Amino acid sequence: MMSVEAIGCEGRKSPKHRVKEMDLATAIEETTVALNLFLNNKFSEARAIFEPWSHASIYHALGHGTISYLQAVMTFDPTDIQEAIKWIKNSIEVANRFRKKTSVMTSMSKMMWKTNYNTYTDEEVHAELCYAESLLERAILSFIQDDNLINFIKGGLKIRNGYHSYKSCVQMFENRTWPSARSKQQFESGVKFGSGTFNLCISMLPKRILKLLEFVGFSGNRIKGLTDLERASKLPCLRSPMCSMVIISYHSIGTYVFGTADGDIELARQILEPCLKNYPKGVIFLFLAARIEEISGNLDEAIDKFQECIASQQEWRQFHHLCYWELMWCHAYKLDWPMAAQYANKLCEESRWSKAIYHHQQASFLAMHLPRTDACIQNINDIYAKVPELKQRIAGKSIPMEKFAVNKAKKHLIHGTENSLVGLELIYIWNGFSILAKKKELLEPVLLLTEATLQQLKKTKGSASRSSGCYWDDYSLAMLLKGITLRYLSRPSQAELCFQEVISNERDLHYDHYLVPYATLELGLLYLQYDRLQEAKTFLTQCRHHNKKYMLENRLHFKMHAALDNLKTKMTQSSEIPAQDSLNLEGEDEERTGPEEDGLEMSIASEASQDSLDKDGPIDGPGTNLKNKDQDSLTGDGSVDGPMNKVGPTEDEIARTNDKEDQDLSSGPR
């Protein structure tokens, strides 16, 4: 029984809220009711259930922390994040009070004998579960506060504590005699929810982050995570809608932001369907429904659903900003630059997340709209001029995307935006081309725009010096964007030439040095797409070891990590790879030993096996080049040179390739 006096939200004992004992089953039932209210947009009513018990009941404390956490991760609003951290810390403290107390002698005995979990009460095992879940939420908040290295390490350290708590929960679930089948089912749901979310989060982190956390002793298994979450989503338990939410978010958002956009859209639709029946006006599931339409390339349907999402509630105003953000991109994908700029302006006026980023986006979208009058150009410059002074510092650190916005704004103020595809550049760095790729009719106008811009740039080439100005920056950006568009249009040879030309321009770039490692990444992704696996491995690892600092490096590493995982799977499945060979995809110069963990398994063989960190054997793949012999395969002699050794194609080579390949698109003005 939980027999602690309830304490008011300010931390004082409140006579008004003095309550009697509450049993675990009632606490879970009330938390389920409150969560359902929250998911049906009754936010104040949900908090009214949680608050009187938030300092006394493990599930009320967890529930209050969880709805605050959901508001934070859905909006990224700094105030919401701080509020969520406050309530999650409270949840950790409350759960810790109800956990099984261990003495020094008990701790020593664990080293010699297995723990007898039958001595734990139901409250104590559920307190351990709530403690682990709160630590996981706190860790994820560390990641979303800022994507710099320090926050990743802090988040990893917090996950470490939650990881060990989840290990204990797995043992409790398997080795305890449960007096109540319902309590056991609720516990199983919680373990699978935490295990699945944990594995998904860790599986998306780049290796460079995991290596710095080597002493933590864990790794993530994506397949295991998704399996656990899908199983738990089907249980009639408190955490079922949360499991569904994580799965849908992973496939519709996570894989697009942190990976290579390989989410299972149909699975997301299937899991979303019963959620929409249970919460037909629930803002979170309406948003996810709109997001699924967006990533499917159904932009008009997505716009309608985001508008429906906004109209569904007025209490949680910050959630409107998230919808404005997606509406801005939907219009940008349609090349409707005035509407995209309009939504960017709404974010400038209403949202507090990053006004520097919003202003940069607004000016960049306006710069894409033609024709531009002198007054329009002056307005664009005025907006760009505000960006540097709006940059924030959080804990002494700048937000990487804000640094990018500031650097680009300064460049455009000096050199202007004529013939600079600033709007398409934003679509690319925010991973929008994977959405454009879903519909050919979305890609064709982009190809025409890039080719027209390249033609205009070539007209100014004679007056531009290779040692000054930003001609080569603008030219290389347009060439990179053209290559990406061609890759998605299944014209690989042309795309390959575009990426190689960007790489060959490295010494001529003055501002946008990030273009070369990103072109290297895109070349690796192209080879991966067409099963030229050895070349894919070479270029994916080369972009990891790029010898210069550049903007948006962390974003590249997330995409590269996801691509290397896909490459590893393909190479393992390839008949040309001997079964006994293992793969070193992180570079042959690294010596890595020890077993690889399989993620957080429901059965944990031994403590020792959990203390190693995702370590592949130092064995290279075979040295032969893998080629696709089909008609649509990439051309070339199979040689694999580094970016610094590549010689870019000439304009004649590109022209000959253009004539040779598909002629279903107009090539734009010549």
What are the functions of these language-model segments?
Residues 1-59, 74, 273-283, 288-291, ...:
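Eukaryotic intrinsically disordered, low-complexity segments enriched for acidic and Ser/Thr/Pro residues
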Residues 48, 98, 105-108, 144-146, ...:
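Generic marker of "main functional regions" within proteins
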Residues 580, 585-667:
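Long, intrinsically disordered, low-complexity tracts enriched in Ser/Thr with interspersed Pro
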